[in-house]
């Protein structure tokens, strides 16, 4: 009997032990499952929606400017300025200014430093050990990375220039499996503001901020033809290179006080002949220019030699946009600079690129509604662009007596486009209307009024009998429509 009790006791003990082990294993599995299903994000914001960051001990002036811009961007998104704070979730490092101790700490993070450390203007953004790590190879690279954070938060690089308001957000985060490694393929990327009203002292800083957000690093002058006297203090603080006569000057060294001059052999100058403004280029035409060797120039070309280099290498040249008004060319500039960084930026096609840009500006739902407007706008301007509608190009080939009055049909298409544009404008929230006007409505209505002004004037000239214009009601009616379009065009430009 005693043996039975002993055996029963041992059996009960084993059962209890097995039950405890089973419970322990189950608990472990539950914890593991909970860990796996938990949202793997690194949050930029605290419980109040405030963004904070830390930096290494020494940073360059352009990085400080970028941080100030970032602070304002975060206020626009979350309602609070981004602040520097010990132990913050965002850690920012400028590689060429790190102390030995700081560099050792960065190495331990396991970030792919070898991919950016020897490249100019490159940067890395990714998550490491529960923090969002931002590393720039130099001053510009670090500043560009900070501006990339603003872009990831929903602030367009063109926001300040096109009155685009970012969507409000209570929290910001980055998934742990996401990272960005960006290295420019074109070393010198920039613009030449020739004979421009924008080259005034009060605009220097504004232009430099646009270049910072677009990740452009060069202001261009060629052979004294351009009268832009760039402000040295602004250029230096934003770490901008200045190029003249195919030689570019930039500051180098850890203290950033040594000047280095470099000769550039191949330069792609877009709209350098002033025949067409940068703002008039469609995405397709701009892409063709950037991909064609026919737009390459070199220093040798100035001495009568071929402007195309047999040893051309895209990664070894400069891309410069010749513009007179950057405010009207921001979309084209952004596209050009994206391609200067990433040759696959338009791999999915121009249509997809435009759609993604509109989505970023206005949201996916509104962007999808706007896309057909832009498609029709580019189709109509590809038939006859506004830049080639007026003198000195003479009358257009549009004919009112052939092909079912193609002149009136062309203008009718613009009337339909204007009506659709206004219909969408009425549905927009108030905070998107200014941005919509600048990005969508203004270029569409500008092209429509120019076409109406020029083509109706052409119609009046063609149908009026010599010496009898005052008695020709049809000709006078066409002339009146042309004058009305001219007045509307003046009002549109004044409002813009």
Language-model regions, residue ranges each:
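Bacterial N-terminal signal peptides that target proteins for export
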Residues: 1-10
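Substrate-binding groove of N-acetylhexosamine-processing glycoside hydrolases
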Residues: 3, 177, 265, 279-280, ...
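Stable alpha-helical elements in mature extracytoplasmic
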Residues: 66, 70, 142-145, 204-207, ...
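Aromatic-lined carbohydrate-binding surfaces of glycoside hydrolases
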Residues: 51, 56-59, 63, 78-87, ...
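Contiguous, structured surface segment used for ligand recognition
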Residues: 23-183
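Structured segments of extracytoplasmic/periplasmic soluble domains
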Residues: 69-81, 148-152, 210, 214, ...
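Bacterial N-terminal signal peptides
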Residues: 9-18
């Amino acid at each position: 009997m005693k043996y039975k009790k002993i055996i029963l006791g041992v059996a009960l003990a084993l059962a209890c032990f097995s039950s405890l082990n089973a419970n322990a294993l189950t608990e472990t599995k539950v914890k593991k499952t909970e860990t796996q299903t938990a949202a793997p994000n690194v949050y930029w914001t605290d419980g109040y929606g405030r963004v904070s960051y830390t930096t290494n001990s020494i940073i360059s002036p352009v990085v400080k400017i970028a941080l100030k811009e970032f602070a304002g961007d975060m206020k626009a998104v979350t309602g609070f300025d981004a602040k520097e704070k010990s132990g913050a979730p965002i850690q920012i490092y400028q590689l060429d200014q790190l102390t030995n101790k700081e560099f050792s700490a960065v190495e331990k993070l396991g970030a792919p430093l070898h991919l950016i450390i020897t490249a100019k203007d490159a940067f890395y953004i990714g998550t490491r050990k529960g923090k969002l790590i931002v590393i720039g190879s130099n001053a510009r690279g670090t500043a560009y990375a900070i501006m990339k954070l603003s872009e990831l938060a929903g602030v367009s690089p063109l926001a300040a220039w096109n009155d685009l308001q970012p969507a409000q957000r209570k929290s910001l985060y980055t998934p742990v499996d996401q990272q960005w490694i960006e290295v420019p393929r074109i070393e010198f990327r920039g613009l030449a503001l020739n004979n421009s009203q924008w080259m005034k002292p009060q605009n220097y800083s504004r232009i430099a901020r646009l270049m910072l957000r677009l990740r452009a690093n060069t202001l261009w002058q060629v052979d004294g033809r351009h009268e832009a006297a760039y402000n040295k203090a602004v250029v230096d603080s934003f770490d901008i290179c200045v190029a003249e006569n195919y030689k570019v000057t930039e500051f180098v060294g850890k203290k950033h006080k040594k000047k280095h001059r470099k000769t550039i052999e191949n330069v792609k100058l877009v709209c350098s002949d002033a025949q067409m403004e940068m703002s008039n280029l469609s995405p397709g035409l701009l892409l063709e220019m950037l991909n064609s060797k026919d737009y390459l120039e070199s220093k040798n070309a100035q001495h009568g030699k071929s402007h195309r280099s047999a040893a051309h290498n895209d990664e070894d040249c400069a891309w410069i946009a010749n513009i007179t008004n950057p405010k009207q060319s921001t979309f084209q500039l952004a596209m050009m600079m994206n391609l200067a960084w990433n040759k696959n930026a338009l791999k999915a096609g121009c249509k997809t690129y435009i759609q993604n840009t509109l989505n970023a500006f206005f949201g996916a739902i509104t962007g999808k509604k706007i896309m057909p407007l832009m498609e029709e706008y580019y189709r109509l301007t590809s038939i006859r662009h506004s830049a080639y509608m007026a003198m000195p190009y003479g009358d257009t080939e549009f004919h009112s007596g052939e092909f079912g009055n193609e002149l009136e049909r062309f203008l009718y298409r613009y009337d339909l486009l204007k009506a659709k544009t206004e219909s969408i404008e009425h549905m927009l929230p108030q905070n998107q209307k200014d941005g919509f006007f600048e990005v969508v409505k203004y270029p569409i209505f500008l092209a429509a009024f120019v076409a109406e002004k020029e083509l109706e004037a052409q119609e009046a000239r063609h149908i009026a009998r010599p010496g009898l214009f005052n008695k020709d009601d049809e000709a006078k009616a066409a002339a009146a429509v042309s004058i009305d379009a001219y007045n509307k065009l003046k009002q549109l430009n004044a409002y813009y």
